[in-house]
Structures are given as structure tokens and as C-alpha cells.
């Protein structure tokens, strides 16, 4: 299915002059998302953490990470959680300071913030940015389906994958190595936290987009 089917869904746009962010990404607002999970199967495995960073644009057309939303999430009823996944992420479900919320609470708050950013940037819909973005989008869509949420601001299948973009820009597809190549500080001890990975992915995405602009690409944002 072509994403043209979704072009008329005006989630956050309004009349008046077109905002440069909307012009840059064809009406879509990039929002970086990372999830930490109980496994690889979005239908059966728990969503344990989710973070989302909205992207802003300055008066010169350069993009930057704007605001991050982060939640530790209670596993949905009947969710599968692989021991290997917990070992990999370091998540301790019984930690007294974990303070997890329901999937509904997490997504409702994130979607509210995303809609606010859509309105501020004159964009019609959010497009997920992620490192290996199909994984994050799959878990997001699965949670939306479980909750029967009717107003999901994200495009259901299009995304920007920073693993692909970093492979093009830096010859690296691993997040830590791509960040190092882009002169972005990356602490491996903090990795696999949804907040940390989201914010580093946002820095990487903005760096690649801005580097392309500096090299002469996308100078005319009204095209």
C-alpha cells in the first residue's frame, strides 16, 4: 500500500503558511522511538520500556532533539518475558524504583505530546525514527492494537531507519559505532535503556540530516 493513502489524514496540520518542518519531510514530523521488550515477538512479548523524542527545527532549517518522553511499562496480561531479554537489557522488573505504568498510560501521554508537536510544526502525522525501526514500530503498533487505540499519530508502516542512514553516512550500522563515527558520545553502560538509546538515536538522526543540508542537499524547503 502506498503511503499516499494517508496524505489526507490531517492529524495536526492547520491553515496558513507551511512550517519548514512540514515542508522538509512532506508533512511528516520525525519522532524518535525506542522500546525495550521481553523478546522479539511484538504480538506475544512484553513492552517493558518506551521512549520518544520529538524533533524540532531552527530558523536556519537545522533539526535538533526537542523533548523526550520516557516510561517504564507494566507487562500486559499474559505477556511473555524471556530471561535472556532481561539479561540483555538489565531491566529488573521487581526493582522498587522501577515505577512502571500501564501501556495505556504510557502511550496516551506520549501521543498527547506528539500531537502537540504536530500542531506546533504544522505537520499532519508523525513518522517513527528508530535504529532498526521496524522492530520499534512493530511493538508500538502491537500495543496500539491491544489497547484498541483509535487515534495513533504515527504512520502505521513508514519509518526512518537510522541503521540504514548511518550505513550510508558513516559506513556503520551498530548504534554505538555509528555514534562514535559521528562524534557523538556513547556510553555502553547506559545502552539498552529506552531513554538513552532514543536520545542517542535522535542525535544521530539530526546529525545525518544536518550534514546532508550542509553538503548542499534540501536547501529549498518549499519545494
From Swiss-Prot:
Record: residues binding Mg(2+) 2: 34, 36, 192, 197
Cofactor note: Binds two Mg(2+) per subunit. The active form of the enzyme binds two Mg(2+) ions in its active site. The first Mg(2+) forms only one salt bridge with the protein.
Domain annotation Exonuclease: ranges: 31-205
Enzyme class: hydrolase
Marked site positions, Important for substrate binding and specificity: 40, 88, 135, 157
Active site (record annotation): 192 (proton donor/acceptor)
Region of interest (Disordered), ranges: 1-21
Matching InterPro entries: Exonuclease_RNaseT/DNA_pol3, RNase_T, RNaseH-like_sf, RNaseH_sf
GO BP: DNA replication proofreading; tRNA processing
Domain of life: Bacteria
Keyword Nucleotide-binding among UniProt keywords: no
Any Pfam family the entry gives: RNase_T
Composition skew (Acidic residues), residue ranges: 1-11
Enzyme nomenclature, EC number: 3.1.13.-
Keywords attached to this entry: Exonuclease, Hydrolase, Magnesium, Metal-binding, Nuclease, tRNA processing
Residues annotated as binding Mg(2+) 1: 34
Function (record text): Trims short 3' overhangs of a variety of RNA species, leaving a one or two nucleotide 3' overhang. Responsible for the end-turnover of tRNA: specifically removes the terminal AMP residue from uncharged tRNA (tRNA-C-C-A). Also appears to be involved in tRNA biosynthesis.
Subunit comment: Homodimer.
Identification of the protein by name: Ribonuclease T
Originating species: Pseudomonas fluorescens (strain ATCC BAA-477 / NRRL B-23932 / Pf-5)
Gene: rnt
Amino acid at each position: 500500500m502506498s503511503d499516499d493513502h494517508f496524505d489526507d489524514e490531517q492529524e495536526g496540520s492547520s491553515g496558513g503558511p507551511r512550517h519548514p518542518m512540514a515542508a522538509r519531510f512532506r508533512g511528516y514530523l520525525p519522532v524518535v522511538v525506542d522500546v525495550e521488550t521481553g523478546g522479539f515477538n511484538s504480538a506475544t512479548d512484553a513492552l517493558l520500556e518506551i521512549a520518544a523524542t520529538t524533533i524540532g527545527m531552527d530558523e536556519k532549517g537545522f533539526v535538533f532533539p526537542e523533548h523526550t518522553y520516557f516510561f517504564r511499562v507494566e507487562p500486559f496480561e499474559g505477556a511473555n518475558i524471556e530471561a535472556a531479554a532481561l539479561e540483555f537489557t538489565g531491566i529488573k522488573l521487581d526493582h522498587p524504583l522501577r515505577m512502571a505504568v500501564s501501556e495505556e498510560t504510557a502511550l496516551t501521554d506520549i501521543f498527547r505530546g506528539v500531537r502537540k508537536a504536530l500542531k506546533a510544526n504544522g505537520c499532519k502525522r508523525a513518522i517513527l525514527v528508530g535504529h532498526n525501526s521496524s522492530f520499534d514500530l512493530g511493538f508500538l503498533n502491537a500495543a496500539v492494537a491491544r489497547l484498541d487505540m483509535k487515534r495513533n499519530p504515527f504512520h502505521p508502516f513508514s519509518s526512518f531507519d537510522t541503521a540504514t542512514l548511518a550505513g550510508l553516512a558513516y559506513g556503520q550500522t551498530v548504534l554505538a559505532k555509528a555514534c562514535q563515527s559521528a562524534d557523538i558520545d556513547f556510553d555502553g553502560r547506559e545502552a539498552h535503556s529506552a531513554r538513552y538509546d532514543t536520545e542517542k538515536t535522535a542525535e544521530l538522526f539530526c546529525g545525518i540530516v544536518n550534514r546532508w543540508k550542509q553538503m548542499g542537499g534540501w536547501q529549498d524547503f518549499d519545494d
